[in-house]
């Protein structure tokens, strides 16, 4: 375990399962209040029609932000179940904070902050919590992300397409606190862990945020951040080019790559092959 509070929550859950611990009405009421606030936010907040750089999006690839600002009408519509996914994240945060409180772990709850950048711009956002003088985020993760992306800070840094690292550093800088890490809950089975971001180069991250803000504000010409990669099967190239993994969940991938085809894998031998985004098909197989 990477944080003392991990052991506190684990111990509390073990005692609760053995009938040796309960949850106070005060803690339960706070969880209920947080859940109510989450429902209100997801179902009663007005839509965000106007593009704005926020702490929650400032770490996304510049090419994606460019489209968000300059070509929003070509965005792939989000499916209705996306709202449930967002709500699940809020519910996980509410319940996990309740477990922290019930276990005796002390922390300060979420707060709104403003990041003042070196060139004078300001970015607003709301962090999840402060513990031991450090800013932490609570994340719900799929089983794959829990095991692979949130395995360590290094793993997250290699594929941080959602900008979790800049987001956390931005919150910490704005709050005048140290960078903490992420409390990650596996949506598949309830496992949880703490992933520390103590190794982060905060100065470099702030510099990257500044460059992103300048790029978007100056309306510079569009430029892709990623190139397609060769498709491989057992380390052998198929002759096809597929979308970079960083682009997989981008809502503008079809606008960015004309002729992009999302097809069942052309190399997989599985009964139900996974879908792959093909930029170029050159394997010679019949389409």
Model feature map: region roles:
Residues 125-127, 133-134, 166-169, 178-181:
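Generic beta-strand structural signal
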């Amino acid at each position: 375990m990477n944080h003392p509070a991990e052991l506190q929550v684990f111990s509390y859950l073990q005692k609760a399962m053995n009938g040796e611990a309960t949850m106070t009405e005060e803690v339960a009421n706070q969880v209920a209040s947080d859940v109510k606030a989450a429902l209100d936010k997801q179902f009663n907040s007005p839509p965000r029609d106007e593009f704005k750089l926020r702490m929650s999006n400032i770490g996304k690839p510049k090419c994606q932000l460019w489209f968000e600002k300059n070509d929003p009408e070509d965005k792939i519509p989000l499916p209705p179940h996306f709202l449930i996914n967002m709500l699940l994240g809020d519910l996980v945060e509410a319940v996990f904070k309740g477990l922290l409180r019930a276990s005796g772990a002390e922390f300060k709850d979420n707060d709104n902050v403003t990041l003042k950048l070196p060139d004078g711009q300001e970015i607003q956002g709301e962090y999840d919590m402060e513990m031991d003088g450090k800013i932490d985020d609570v994340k719900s993760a799929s089983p794959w992300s829990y095991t692979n992306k949130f395995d360590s800070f290094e793993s997250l840094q290699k594929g941080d397409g959602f900008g979790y690292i800049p987001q956390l550093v931005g919150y910490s800088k704005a709050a005048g606190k140290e960078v903490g890490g992420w409390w990650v809950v596996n949506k598949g089975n309830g496992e949880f862990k703490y992933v520390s971001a103590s190794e982060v180069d905060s100065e470099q991250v702030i510099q990257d945020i500044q460059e992103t803000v300048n790029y978007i504000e100056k309306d510079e010409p569009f430029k892709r951040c990623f190139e397609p990669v060769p498709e491989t099967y057992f380390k052998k190239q198929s002759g096809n080019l597929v979308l970079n993994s960083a682009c997989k969940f981008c809502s503008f991938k079809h606008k960015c790559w004309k002729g992009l085809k999302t097809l069942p894998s052309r190399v997989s031998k599985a009964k139900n092959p996974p879908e792959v985004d093909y930029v170029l098909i050159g394997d010679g197989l019949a389409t």
